[in-house]
A protein has these predicted regions:
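Short coil/turn motifs that cap or connect alpha-helices
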Residues: 140, 287-288, 370
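Short cytosolic juxtamembrane segments of multi-pass membrane proteins
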Residues: 1, 367-385
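N-terminal Sec/SRP start-transfer signal
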Residues: 1-30, 296, 383-415
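Juxtamembrane/interface segments at transmembrane-helix termini
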Residues: 39, 43-47, 359-372
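Small-residue-rich transmembrane alpha-helices
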Residues: 264-269, 274-276, 300-333, 341-368
Length: 415
């Protein structure tokens, strides 16, 4: 009998355990990598878009209007970007878009900018349209849409920096069939006969928001002020990536530890049940290092194979999760999934390392015993569980209680 042949027979004997171990390891590694990578992708995609297209830090309304000179003076004095903003809600009451509300913006110049996809900037009689609404109504670039008194040719699709999360009202919900954003040039905007909702958008280049607000309230009297952190259209997508990452860092390690502990416990028990073989190996002249190395191989298979499978399957899973969050929760954004390297390294290395370390420690402890005790299988430590020793309860009840309380580690992991 060679030590290598014995390893092969042991794996065949416990093949179901190794298959389950590989599956559990793969699932755990897959979830860790996919969840962390999805969170990082969401955060990067949204923050990059918000930064590139200059989403506001706050919006406010004042009782006294700001003139262009006032805006320029405040920008120079406080190092801020300030812009008058406004929109007109057009309720469509006929045609294919009957019942929809279209929020029309004039093209912004400084803040809350927009991207242009699959087309060009709007000119006379043209408009940009948010893509989720367009997809819901099968509207293509080049098609013409009617808003009652006015018709526009869709020149391109767009996403506006302050409307990534497409809410008509802050307390409402997303309805891609009934609400959309359009962006037209100033001349087309002025032609629309609808009430304008006006406000000011501001972006701070340094940490002086309190000082600026104090000045605004003193000179113009602030009627309302809403920071971007409380603006659901901006804060929801910005925070969702962090929320996914936080959930991944909280729950994935717990699952990881539970699965690893279960597998390590079973591997350790398998070695204990075969301790007579350790005595045989010693008698055959194998060194302790060779014996430990032999048993370490038992941890390599589920660790390496499971981790590799888990990391490979995490690639398509990350793509699916990104699609779920970005394409179903947010207005259309151009993105490419990014994979978190530290989580990949952890998923590849940690399971194998822990499996092998646990087995090596267990084998090392057993090898400290006398070879004769190992051969006779008397090297196994036993202890008497004295729980309910003097109780008059039925023996069956005593045994059940002792099986739980007498093995606290196993019971905790099972729970």
């Amino acid at each position: 009998m060679t030590i290598n042949k014995r390893a092969g027979r042991s794996v065949k004997k416990n093949i179901s355990f190794y298959i389950i171990s590989i599956i559990l390891t793969a699932i755990t590694s897959m979830i860790i990598v996919a969840a962390v990578s999805t969170g990082r992708t969401l955060t990067k995609v949204v923050r990059d878009f918000v930064d590139e297209y200059k989403a506001e830090d706050a919006e406010f309304v004042t009782y006294k209007p700001l003139t262009n000179d006032d805006i320029e003076k405040l920008e120079n004095e406080y190092d801020v970007i300030l812009e008058y903003s406004g929109y007109k809600d057009v309720k469509v009451e006929s045609g294919d878009l009957d019942g929809a509300t279209i929020r029309v913006f004039a093209k912004p110049e400084k803040l809350n900018l927009y991207d242009v996809r699959d087309g060009h900037e709007p000119g006379d009689g043209e408009t940009l349209l948010t893509q989720d609404f367009a997809d819901a109504h099968n509207i293509k670039v080049g098609d013409e849409i009617s808003l009652g008194d006015h018709s526009y040719k869709v020149s391109a699709y767009t996403t506006k920096a302050d409307y990534i999360y497409m809410l008509q009202t802050f307390t409402g919900f997303i309805d891609n069939e009934k609400f959309a954003v359009m962006i037209v040039d100033r001349q087309e905007y002025d032609k629309i006969d609808a009430e304008e909702t006006a406000y000011y958008s501001i972006k701070y280049n340094k940490d002086n928001s309190k000082e600026v607000r104090k000045r605004l309230n003193k000179d113009y009297v602030i009627a309302s002020y809403m920071a971007a952190t409380t603006n659901t259209r901006i804060s929801m997508p910005v925070n969702e990536g962090d929320a996914v990452s936080n959930m991944a860092t909280m729950f994935a390690p717990v699952m990881f530890i539970i699965v690893l502990t279960l597998i390590v416990m079973v591997l350790g028990r398998n070695i204990k049940s075969e301790q007579y073989l350790l005595g045989t190996f010693i008698s055959l002249g194998f060194s302790r290092k060779q014996i430990v190395g032999h048993y370490v191989r038992y941890g390599l298979m589920p660790g390496v194979i499971g981790s590799v499978i888990g990391v490979l399957t995490s690639i398509p899973l990350t793509g699916l999760l990104c699609t779920f969050y970005i394409e179903y929760d947010f207005e259309t954004l151009i993105y490419k999934p990014t994979y978190n390297i530290p989580s990949i390294i952890t998923a590849l290395v940690l399971p194998t390392l822990l499996y092998c370390a646990a087995i090596a420690i267990q084998a090392g402890r057993l090898l400290k015993k006398a070879p004769v005790d190992l051969l006779r299988n008397t090297g196994k430590e036993t202890k008497t569980i004295g729980i309910m020793k003097d109780s008059h309860a039925k023996t069956q009840i005593k045994m059940r209680v002792r099986s739980v309380i007498g093995h606290p580690g196993r019971s905790i992991v099972t729970i």
